[in-house]
């Protein structure tokens, strides 16, 4: 792709997301979503092949359907209230349709079907954009309309997402699909706490993006897309392979790694609101997610066939501008737990 064309498309995608996040008018929100959608399709299809075309088509159809539902909710709300302001959504029908549209855009269950398939069909860089940047705009709208949202629908979707995110990743050997199911589960945790403490949702999103960014950067550095290819890199780049596995355990929420912080804080916040069954169910379902990360770590590092290796091992990162942030991201993705007392200001 021509660099000028690619820069223009990327700028349009970024502008679309920024417009959604900064707008208080429903029409501008819808325009921002459409700008972002039309610009992100060529980015997903940057490596032009049949699988990328199929994945991009699935993504386009799903997001277009969600945009149609979004506009329907906006029109229904406008007919009943006469308001275009985001925060003024009082009609229950409009609220339910809006919740469904945003759930579909985020890839939450039961509209999660597109996330693993689309992520698997595109490159690692496109997958990183899909699972991080593309979550910001819908989550920002959920954050703004949290007081008037359909709570029952949102909590049901959150619980189903945590369950599906753990259950779906159990038999996967493709690392991109594993990351996709992990994303579904994390989105479930974020939406579960949204109506109780929206600020905590944003903190969870920040930690999730940081860990996902680190994982994808290491996978790109290692050129690994399957569990088999990851295990084959152990003799060549043991440091990078070890870091990938540690950060994946952090994504699973294993203490004392950074990924444990949001789960701990969310469970604590839910119990403060006299909710016992919900956090207990979430904690039990999160064990499925942690299990497949532990199994991946075990099969990759502890069940290797003993062999003599005459290759030179790479114990240092190659110098490159793209990887200059990587050491900082690795530290933050694994060692944030000592900052936990500082985060008590959210309570």
Swiss-Prot record:
It catalyses: a ubiquinone + NADH + 5 H(+)(in) = a ubiquinol + NAD(+) + 4 H(+)(out). GO terms for molecular function: NADH dehydrogenase (ubiquinone) activity. The chain crosses the membrane at residues 3-23, 25-45, 59-79, 111-131, 149-169, 178-198, 201-221, 242-262, 274-294, 325-345. One of its GO terms (biological process) is mitochondrial electron transport, NADH to ubiquinone. It is an enzyme of class 7 (translocase). Its EC number is 7.1.1.2. Keywords: Electron transport, Membrane, Mitochondrion, Mitochondrion inner membrane, NAD, Respiratory chain, Translocase, Transmembrane, Transmembrane helix, Transport, Ubiquinone. The keyword Electron transport applies. It is found in: Mitochondrion inner membrane. Core subunit of respiratory chain NADH dehydrogenase (Complex I) which is composed of 45 different subunits. Interacts with TMEM242. This is NADH-ubiquinone oxidoreductase chain 2. It comes from Rhinoceros unicornis.
């Amino acid at each position: 792709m021509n660099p000028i064309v690619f820069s223009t498309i990327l700028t349009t995608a970024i502008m679309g997301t920024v417009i959604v996040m900064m707008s208080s008018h429903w029409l501008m929100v819808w325009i921002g979503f459409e700008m972002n959608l039309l610009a992100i399709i060529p980015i997903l299809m940057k490596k032009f092949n049949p699988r990328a075309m199929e994945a991009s088509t699935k993504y386009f159809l799903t997001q277009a359907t969600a945009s149609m539902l979004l506009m329907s909710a906006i029109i229904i709300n406008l007919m009943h209230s006469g308001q275009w302001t985001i925060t003024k959504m009082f009609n229950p029908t409009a609220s339910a349709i809006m919740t469904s549209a945003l759930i579909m855009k985020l890839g939450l269950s039961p509209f999660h079907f597109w996330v693993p398939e689309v992520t698997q069909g595109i490159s690692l860089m496109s997958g990183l954009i899909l699972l991080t940047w593309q979550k910001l705009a819908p989550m920002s709208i959920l954050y703004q309309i949290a007081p008037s949202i359909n709570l029952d629908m949102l909590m049901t979707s959150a619980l189903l997402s945590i369950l599906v995110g753990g259950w779906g990743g159990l038999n996967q050997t493709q690392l991109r699909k594993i990351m996709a199911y992990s994303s579904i589960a994390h989105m479930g945790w974020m939406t579960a706490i949204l109506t109780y403490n929206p600020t905590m949702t944003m903190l969870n999103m920040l930690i999730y993006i940081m860990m996902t960014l680190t994982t994808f950067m290491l996978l790109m550095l290692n050129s690994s897309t399957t569990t088999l290819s990851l295990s084959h890199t152990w003799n060549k780049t043991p440091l990078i392979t070890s870091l990938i596995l540690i950060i994946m355990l952090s994504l699973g929420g294993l203490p004392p790694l950074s990924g444990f912080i949001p789960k701990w804080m969310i469970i604590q916040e839910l119990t403060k609101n006299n909710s016992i069954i919900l956090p207990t169910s979430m904690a039990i379902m999160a064990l499925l997610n942690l299990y497949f990360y532990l199994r991946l770590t075990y099969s990759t590092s502890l069940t290797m066939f003993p062999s003599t290796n005459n290759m030179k091992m790479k114990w240092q990162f190659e110098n490159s501008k793209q990887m200059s942030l990587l050491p900082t991201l690795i530290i933050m993705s694994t060692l944030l737990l000592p900052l936990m007392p500082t985060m008590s200001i959210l309570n």
